[in-house]
A protein has these predicted regions:
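Extracellular glycan-interacting surfaces
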Residues: 1-128
Length: 128
């Protein structure tokens, strides 16, 4: 699966499964706008009834499986984040962007693994 990562140096295509930076692409990353009224909200992403909110606190994520009616905390071991993206067809696949590294969850934001590539100053991330 491929994602686009907006950085200060441009937008990179990243193969998430093979953990490879495929190169720069000429495509802007539109940060998803999810209408949420949560304190200290940094970014949010949704697919179906799954909503993942990145907040400026520890742990950095709030996850809802019922479109925001109830929430659970997630990402206790993650660093501060800048962006998040829920895969539109597989809502258990979630990308979390820290300053220069992507983290992937394949189980609805319960467990995370750092992806190998480091990128310069990540600003946004989106599945493509």
């Amino acid at each position: 699966m491929i994602c686009h990562v907006a950085t200060l140096d441009g937008t990179y295509a990243v193969d998430v499964d093979d953990e490879l930076v495929l190169g720069l692409v000429d495509s802007p990353v539109e940060q998803e706008r999810v209408p949420l009224e949560l304190p200290r909200l940094v970014a949010a992403s949704a697919a179906g009834s799954t909503v993942v909110a990145l907040v400026e606190r520890r742990p950095p994520l709030l996850v809802s499986s019922d479109a925001g009616s109830t929430w659970r905390e997630a990402g206790g071991g993650l660093p501060a984040g800048f962006a998040v993206a829920v895969h539109p067809d597989e809502p258990d696949r979630v990308l979390f962007a820290a300053r220069n590294r992507l983290y992937l969850s394949v189980d609805g934001a319960r467990f995370w693994r750092a992806l190998e590539p480091e990128l310069p100053d990540i600003e946004a991330v989106a599945w493509v």
